[in-house]
């Protein structure tokens, strides 16, 4: 997306970054939220706060990709295009949910969590985050290449634990539990042009399930750009490397009509 041509708006979703979150003061008294709440808040920010009545495209990765699917469903006339990356339009299920549950349960069952009203950060948050990152990220082939034996693997794990960890446990807990009821029902009614960008080695969105292909067939329009696994891919994190998909996106957005209403 050409920043000289378009205004690019980057939003910290509820519970993340500089947006409102438990660590701002309320701790466990902070209201629960889900992905639907995130999208509603983003829409109100754009329409009420910035007074923008139509946008060119909604683009998001992972959680942002799931938010992007919801955008297309909840506000079908608001954008010309949606570009969900590393995200499947289906209910949270299987390994994707189970591994997230490990994060929340490890924090909630940690005595140091104290019902969310701790004075020192429970160590379970760091442990669960590192586990989840290795389990559902980085790419299977890449991990084997970087850790061909237990020696290198031990070094990688030790390095991960030695790195500074400043994320608040309640913030992490709320963020992951926000995805629990994700279920983009009604995607068949999406009107915006669609470019789905996924990678063949995405651990959280296995291509063998065919979820995106099925959804696009039911929607009746849209394209999936699948990045083949290779030396420059990193599993779920593959789309961090824009060089792998920027040409496909540029060609797509060039052909999307303006002002889809």
Regions found by a protein language model. Name each.
Residues 1-37:
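Active-site machinery of serine-nucleophile hydrolases
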Residues 36-57:
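Conserved acidic catalytic loop of the alpha/beta-hydrolase fold
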Residues 65-76, 82:
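Short glycine-enriched nucleophile-adjacent loop
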Residues 78-162:
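Alpha/beta-hydrolase-fold enzymes
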Residues 170-186:
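Active-site nucleophile elbow and catalytic-triad environment of alpha/beta-hydrolase enzymes
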Residues 190, 196-198:
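Short beta-strand/loop motif that positions the catalytic acidic residue
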Residues 203-211:
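Conserved alpha/beta-hydrolase "acid-adjacent" motif
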Residues 214, 219-261:
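Catalytic active-site module of serine/aspartate enzymes centered on a nucleophile-bearing elbow/loop
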